[in-house]
Amino acid sequence: MRKIYATGKRKTAIAKVWLTPGKGELSINEQSLNQWLGGHEAIKMKVMQPLLLTKQEQSVDIKAVVFGGGYSAQAEALRHGISKALNAYDIAFRAVLKPKGLLTRDSRVVERKKYGKRKARRSPQFSKR
């Protein structure tokens, strides 16, 4: 029985994912998916997407630790980590995951604040007179 480790990232959220062959148990921060997310069905589907695409929702166990960011960023980091772990588990899954963009790290992060500006791009109000 081999244990596969992968990390997923999105904005400031980081997901550490361990994948093992099993019965389809999903543990996130020592909680089930429903306890961790509550009633957010759209975010649940986002997390389950790589498992559903590869038809592995009943054949692998996933244990994950997620921190940083908000729920949406954490869910996308988790999806990225699960996709990378599935790719390492069986290279044939790459053909399914890659076209959907699930193996690609979303590099969009918050732009830094610049001096002389109020925010990243917002300038102080300009007055001609």
Curated annotation (Swiss-Prot):
GO terms for biological process: translation. It holds the Pfam family Ribosomal_S9. PROSITE patterns: RIBOSOMAL_S9. GO terms for cellular component: cytosolic small ribosomal subunit. InterPro entries: Ribosomal_Su5_D2-typ_SF, Ribosomal_uS9, Ribosomal_uS9_bac/plastid, Ribosomal_uS9_CS, Ribsml_uS5_D2-typ_fold_subgr. GO terms for molecular function: RNA binding; structural constituent of ribosome. Keywords: Ribonucleoprotein, Ribosomal protein. Belongs to the universal ribosomal protein uS9 family. This is Small ribosomal subunit protein uS9. The lineage of its organism: Bacteria, Pseudomonadati, Campylobacterota, Epsilonproteobacteria, Campylobacterales.
